[in-house]
């Protein structure tokens, strides 16, 4: 569809063939759609006098700028049909009468100069002519491939003499190298050796070997010294660690292996807990010196849980509740109780919870003092 702005209409009025030449100031309404799809009824109704333009196509609607002045419908129809019969740009096969359902789109509404620019073939462009004037690209491409094939036939690796390779490379002087030699030279900085590296000696080839230092023939691992001579594992490790040859006096007939622990040692070994004689039984010595030494050793603060401090009623350590004289007098009986408390505070807490609680906060300590006076031993 072609939309003509109202500002350009006055300059196009002389070139429109279907308008009368009486000089009446008319303005063409904007065309809504391509007139080739319009029906004859819609075209005849579009030029009724005294009415505004209805939409040319029922699919689109545009408002007109000014209504057409009252002219005879026959004159307008005759002028329009005569314009359709013009053979503009040699298109007689597309021009039909007014009563036909198809009409030529551009000469009726647009000037011939504009119509020729818009109705030109999409292939009539200078770009197409330039593409056609150029040679066929396929032929040039095949020619280049053949040229490179001919040029690459004479290549040869200057190191190993290979004639074919997935990728040709060059060394520092510009000579061609195959992919393997080029990569080796790039990574190591030297030319790739032409012979394959020697494989490790098999078991049959190691039969006649002997250590160059101790002259043994049995070893778990053969090594080489600085001169490249084969040495046994012991001599090689000794030389590596100490920097001097291994003395011949250290030679042994058998191979000394590392004493490794068996894998099932942890499964067969039973866990050894704290001995009951060390933690729960009192000391057998009855001398005062041993009793006083044990008492001073056990005067260290007992580590308890934070929740037990509120049960005791005072933040001071348990060792401060007893005097040195009281503990020294009953060292044989108080020692196992304190050691039991130090080793297992949870067990002592359970023992305290089982004892009857009185209104006083220090009833648990009173029961401990009573048990101590009677010579009883509190066990977990």
Swiss-Prot record:
<dbReference type="GO" id="GO:0003677">
    <property type="term" value="F:DNA binding"/>
</dbReference>
<dbReference type="GO" id="GO:0000981">
    <property type="term" value="F:DNA-binding transcription factor activity, RNA polymerase II-specific"/>
</dbReference>
<dbReference type="InterPro" id="IPR000679">
    <property type="entry name" value="Znf_GATA"/>
</dbReference>
<dbReference type="InterPro" id="IPR013088">
    <property type="entry name" value="Znf_NHR/GATA"/>
</dbReference>
<comment type="function">
    <text>Transcriptional activator. Binds to the consensus sequence 5'-AGATAG-3'.</text>
</comment>
<dbReference type="GO" id="GO:0005634">
    <property type="term" value="C:nucleus"/>
</dbReference>
<dbReference type="GO" id="GO:0000122">
    <property type="term" value="P:negative regulation of transcription by RNA polymerase II"/>
</dbReference>
<dbReference type="GO" id="GO:0008270">
    <property type="term" value="F:zinc ion binding"/>
</dbReference>
<dbReference type="InterPro" id="IPR016375">
    <property type="entry name" value="TF_GATA_4/5/6"/>
</dbReference>
<dbReference type="InterPro" id="IPR039355">
    <property type="entry name" value="Transcription_factor_GATA"/>
</dbReference>
<keyword id="KW-0010">Activator</keyword>
<feature type="compositionally biased region" description="Low complexity">
    <location>
        <begin position="14"/>
        <end position="35"/>
    </location>
</feature>
<keyword id="KW-0863">Zinc-finger</keyword>
<feature type="compositionally biased region" description="Low complexity">
    <location>
        <begin position="275"/>
        <end position="296"/>
    </location>
</feature>
<feature type="compositionally biased region" description="Basic residues">
    <location>
        <begin position="257"/>
        <end position="266"/>
    </location>
</feature>
<dbReference type="GO" id="GO:0000978">
    <property type="term" value="F:RNA polymerase II cis-regulatory region sequence-specific DNA binding"/>
</dbReference>
<keyword id="KW-0677">Repeat</keyword>
<keyword id="KW-0805">Transcription regulation</keyword>
<dbReference type="Pfam" id="PF05349">
    <property type="entry name" value="GATA-N"/>
</dbReference>
<feature type="compositionally biased region" description="Low complexity">
    <location>
        <begin position="58"/>
        <end position="73"/>
    </location>
</feature>
<feature type="zinc finger region" description="GATA-type 1">
    <location>
        <begin position="157"/>
        <end position="181"/>
    </location>
</feature>
<dbReference type="GO" id="GO:0045893">
    <property type="term" value="P:positive regulation of DNA-templated transcription"/>
</dbReference>
<feature type="zinc finger region" description="GATA-type 2">
    <location>
        <begin position="211"/>
        <end position="235"/>
    </location>
</feature>
<keyword id="KW-0479">Metal-binding</keyword>
<dbReference type="GO" id="GO:0032526">
    <property type="term" value="P:response to retinoic acid"/>
</dbReference>
<keyword id="KW-0238">DNA-binding</keyword>
<dbReference type="GO" id="GO:0045944">
    <property type="term" value="P:positive regulation of transcription by RNA polymerase II"/>
</dbReference>
<keyword id="KW-0539">Nucleus</keyword>
<feature type="region of interest" description="Disordered">
    <location>
        <begin position="14"/>
        <end position="73"/>
    </location>
</feature>
<dbReference type="InterPro" id="IPR008013">
    <property type="entry name" value="GATA_N"/>
</dbReference>
<dbReference type="GO" id="GO:0045165">
    <property type="term" value="P:cell fate commitment"/>
</dbReference>
<keyword id="KW-0804">Transcription</keyword>
<keyword id="KW-0862">Zinc</keyword>
<protein>
    <recommendedName>
        <fullName>Transcription factor GATA-4</fullName>
    </recommendedName>
</protein>
<dbReference type="Pfam" id="PF00320">
    <property type="entry name" value="GATA"/>
</dbReference>
<feature type="region of interest" description="Disordered">
    <location>
        <begin position="254"/>
        <end position="316"/>
    </location>
</feature>
